[in-house]
Amino acid sequence: HPGFTRKVQHPQRAQENPVLSPDRPWEGEAVQAWGSVLHDDEEGILKMWYLGTGHGRSTICYATSKDGVSWDKPDLGVVSFDGSTANNIVYPPTGDVHDIDPWGVIKDPLEQDESRRYKLAGYRQLPAPPDVPEETPDMDREARNARRKILFDRIRDRHGMCAAYSPDGIHWTVDDTVLVPRAGDAGSLVYDPMARRYLATS
């Protein structure tokens, strides 16, 4: 377009790295942010939704920042962890590391339904059917492989891309519908205002 030029900027690694570390019990051993950071133009801050993993269960947590380097983890009082809601968890630990892994969160200014102002897309593996036997430590290799084959056949369409909605980015409702079966466990979510369509990649 006349009058515009493209210029590639070279990112500089922040000396403060890592800017987010798992320093709370509910965050486990690692934090993963994927693409879940946005700038809230109305509030003038950055918001992050990240996954705490490595403790046999997953938690989705929330943090805010003014500069993208120093992040605050507010006590939200939403989810109980070890008997206390003094934490920044917005989605409870379930014991299943693949409950929902957030790919990305968007704040949709055009949404008419206030309860769906924030939208999250992510990977989710729904629980296995009750007739699939549990894997036990005493299973031999043949029995374990047989169980996993049954499990894979039964959950073929029970995992993939799912969505969640929120009025404020803190209180979430997860839709159990698998929107894109067998989608991968990492991706992104954006909104194209020109085409008025959502785009998810996996």
Regions found by a protein language model. Give the residues of each.
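Carbohydrate-active catalytic/glycan-binding domains of CAZyme proteins
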Residues: H1-S202
